[in-house]
Regions:
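Nucleic-acid nuclease catalytic cores
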Residues: 69-164, 766-768, 772-773
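A contiguous, basic/glycine-rich beta-loop/short-helix subdomain that forms a polymer-engagement track
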Residues: 332-352, 357, 368-375, 478-604, ...
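Conserved RecA-like P-loop NTPase helicase motor core
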Residues: 601-612, 662-773
Length: 811
């Protein structure tokens, strides 16, 4: 529920959690309620309540309480739920249950902020019950040990007048914060009315797009925008959404798949001339960690130690918000390190206060790392989501909910644990072996013949639950070891083991809910045997349920890309409500004569014919390169296919041939792009469709003159892809298209989009495969590539046609 203020009625409704959050800053593990959020902590909590329900007559749990009191000229209402309640003669006893690790925490609890927090919350509940029922009350703080299950009960003293005074003061502080925020919101609302578009003129199509985006925000719609590269989608979406967010007091999340796209949005935000709004760009925790080891606990990190006190005394968040309009991660890192506080936690606090949050998809859609505001439907209801390059979100969402247990990776963890000298090492090694046995038992169900196999297997939910419980007990002991002085090491194998299994277990309970509910048909449990080792995979064929839960909770969303066809595919697999979803398709704003598209239909790149046609494909690439005055990008469906064609390329006098490594580093990618830019002899760059040189990268000016796309780039046929095909056939009657053609042709169109980025760019796109002119592939070729029919793209000689195009355009 959080905080709700009605200025007209002079009422404020608040939850204990909101009051506590305003008074107690927490970090890392404790930010998420620590042990209480662990599976083992919840189990202990349930067990303690179960014992009380069984052993204490009339014991009640989760009873709602509501308490009204005056705060100046406001009526305040505190709403919450009691962990436990029972009657002892004439008095009412209220229980508050908290999970701890007795061996480490109990001795340090007395006088700690943690105990103050526990007791404060309980006293508020005591006051609420006393006022509501007019009876004597007593409070018990029930501490439960997550390792042994033991409990310790502490009586909590209760002075009604003192508690009411404390509660009143805390609400008064929250109201002051609210009034300050409200005044700032009024200033933002006023500025929004005149917030200028950051450029002198709209490009063709931009004004129409901006108007549709504004309408979607105003009406609460989901808007799927398919617009070609170069139209200026970034500012056409960002400006109207920012105006709406400032006008209505909403938060705007700008979500991208790559950091280069984030930089583009930040530059656009900087160009928008406004003083009242604040934006922050988030960076991954590992890259924002100032400690030598990523371990977010005050006992192991000086930047986490005394975090609350240092933040309070430094006023860092307020100072950053007062002095910077956009909060860059580099600046946040340096300022936080100077105050010796955790830079990542500071960025999270800034994100809570900022009007615009720019970051990776993970911060809203990944169930493990998403921001707290993205997990709360009420908070999402006051948020706008802008999803850039939204064609990537289906696969990314599928990845969030397709965890796997890999024997090869588990074996590596076991080796690292073997060299780790903490007391918990033996237990950790045994835990890894148990998880490996889980994978081995699943793989044993596969047919014995052959080095490779994959099939559906059953999942033992009880076995997974037991493993989760024991792994969390191990985690508790391991953290105690570290606290006692055990060596901390980078990439802690015990933490890696726990979080790997925890994600798998969480998704398993989603796929096969406890309590006898029907398994979700969108998920499969797959055992895989391969030369690299066995794997147990939870395959999310359709991520629409979890993604839709987030997107549909938002006030409005815009999903944009150069490739969102067919729109019903993205609507359905993103889980967007049909009655809220609109589609906007915009044509290219650039002259059609600036680009030529040719199809070389005399080759067949299907798997069966691929080897036969490799020599002809090499000739096609060479012909285009010879006819082209500038750099050429040739894209292949795989590195193996690329190398087969490369081996058959004839000599190309005066042209450099580059083939980046399969897993090129950022430094190598930057160097390669620099070579394209250096003005020397032209380059033939060989890369793969869907890779770093095919998507999310710009080739401005004359960096690129032609793109050759070899094959429709369909996903590889394998067991998992075939399971998706069967699922899509059953649900949509479009199995092959949804599992293979749409992903492949999306890559093709994305690759071609690298070529024309402005009205002065010219170039040639060559599609090498006869399938491009056959159904269903031809259906996914953009309409602005041809006049009346895709057959117009057929070329008898792509080399001659390419040379003729550049002769005509004067390049």
């Amino acid at each position: 529920m959080g905080l709700s203020v009605d200025l007209a009625r002079k009422t404020v409704t608040v939850s204990p959690a909101t009051l506590l959050a305003g008074a107690f800053r927490r970090i890392g593990f404790d930010r998420g309620e620590g042990f209480e959020r662990l599976w083992i902590g919840q189990a202990v909590h349930r067990r303690v309540l179960g014992e009380f329900l069984e052993g204490v007559p009339g014991y009640e749990t989760e009873r709602a309480v509501r308490f009204s009191f005056d705060v100046d000229d406001f009526t305040a209402v505190l709403e919450g739920r009691l962990d436990g309640r029972f009657e002892d003669g004439e008095r009412v006893v209220v229980d508050e249950i908290k999970s701890l690790h007795f061996a480490e925490d109990l001795g340090r609890l007395a006088g700690s902020p943690r105990l103050v927090r526990f007791e404060t919350q309980l006293r508020w509940y005591l006051l609420a019950v006393a006022r509501a029922e007019g009876r004597e009350v007593a409070g018990r703080l029930v501490l439960a040990d997550i390792e042994t299950g033991a409990t310790r009960i502490q009586s909590v003293a209760f002075d009604p007048a003192a508690v009411l005074a404390d509660l009143t003061e805390r609400v008064r502080w929250l109201l002051a914060e609210f009034h300050a925020a409200h005044a700032l919101s009024e200033a933002k609302r006023a500025e929004a009315r005149t917030l200028p578009f950051p450029f002198e003129d709209y490009r063709p199509g931009q004004l129409a797009m901006a108007a549709e985006v504004a309408r979607a925000a105003a009406t609460g719609a989901h808007l799927l925008v398919e617009a070609p590269t170069g139209i200026g989608k970034t500012v056409a979406a960002l400006h109207p959404l920012l105006v709406d967010a400032l006008s209505r007091g909403r938060k705007l999340y700008v979500l991208t798949a790559k950091t280069t796209q984030q930089e583009m949005f930040v530059r656009t935000l900087d160009a928008i001339d406004g003083e009242s709004f604040r934006s922050v760009r988030l960076r991954a925790k590992e890259r924002m960690c100032a400690n030598d080891v990523v371990l977010c606990h005050e006992d192991h990190c000086r930047f986490a130690k005394d975090y609350a006190a240092k933040m309070e005394s430094s006023g860092l968040v307020e100072r950053l918000l007062d002095t910077r309009r956009h909060l860059d991660p580099d600046d946040v890192f340096e300022e936080a390190r100077r105050e010796e506080v955790c830079p990542f936690e500071v960025s999270l606090e800034l994100a809570e206060r900022a009007d615009v949050v720019v970051g990776d998809y993970n911060y809203v859609f990944d169930p493990v790392v998403s921001l707290s505001g993205a997990r709360d439907p009420a908070a999402l209801g006051e948020a706008l989501l802008l999803v850039d390059e939204a064609h990537n979100l289906v696969d990314r969402g599928r990845g969030y909910y397709s965890p796997e247990l890999s024997d090869a990776e588990l074996s590596g963890l076991e080796e690292r644990i073997g060299s780790f000298l903490a007391r918990a090492a033996w237990d950790a090694a045994e835990a890894v072996r148990r998880v490996r046995r889980l994978v081995a038992d699943a793989a044993a169900l596969l047919p014995a013949e052959g080095p490779e196999a994959a099939d559906l297997v059953p999942l033992d939910a009880r076995r997974l639950d037991d493993l989760r419980h024991d792994l969390e007990a191990l985690l508790v002991r391991h953290l105690a070891d570290l606290r006692a002085g055990a060596d901390r090491i980078p990439d802690d194998p015990v933490l890696d083991l726990y979080f790997t299994f925890a994600r798998f277990h969480d998704v398993a309970r989603m796929a096969q809910p406890p309590g006898g509910e029907r398994p979700d048909p969108a998920f499969d449990v797959v055992a895989i045997r391969a030369p690299s080792g066995s794997r147990l995979l939870l395959l999310c064929k359709d991520p629409s349920r979890p993604l839709g839960a987030v997107l549909n909770a938002a006030a409005a969303t815009v999903e944009m890309s150069a490739t969102l066809s067919p729109p019903e595919f993205y609507r359905d697999l993103l889980g967007l409500s049909r009655d809220r979803t609109d589609v906007l398709r915009l044509p290219s704003p650039f002259p059609r004569e600036n680009r030529a598209v040719f199809v070389a239909a005399d080759v067949d790149t299907s798997y069966a014919a691929r080897t036969r046609d490799v020599p002809r494909l090499a000739a096609i690439v060479a012909e285009v390169a010879a006819a082209c005055p500038g750099n050429v990008l040739a894209l292949f469906p795989s590195y193996r296919f690329l190398d087969d064609v490369r081996a058959r390329l004839p000599a190309l006098p005066g042209r450099r041939v580059l083939r980046p490594s399969d897993r090129s580093t950022e430094l190598e990618r930057t160097s390669t792009l620099g070579t394209l830019r250096d003005g020397g002899s032209p380059v033939l760059l060989l890369a793969v469709s869907g890779g770093a040189f095919a998507e999310g990268v710009d080739y401005p000016g004359e960096m690129l003159s032609a793109v050759v796309v070899v094959s429709p780039a369909l996903p590889q046929v394998r067991f998992e892809q075939e399971r998706m095909r069967q699922y899509f056939e059953e649900r949509f009657e479009k199995g092959f298209e949804y599992a293979y053609v749409v992903p492949g042709m999306t890559r093709v169109v994305q690759s071609a989009g690298r070529l024309i980025r402005s009205e002065s760019d010219t170039g040639v796109v060559v599609l090498a495969c006869k399938r491009f002119l056959r159904e269903p592939y031809r259906r996914y070729l953009p309409a602005d590539w041809y006049g009346d029919d895709p057959s117009e793209l057929l070329s008898a000689s792509v080399g001659d046609d390419t040379a003729a195009f550049f002769a005509r355009t004067g390049r």
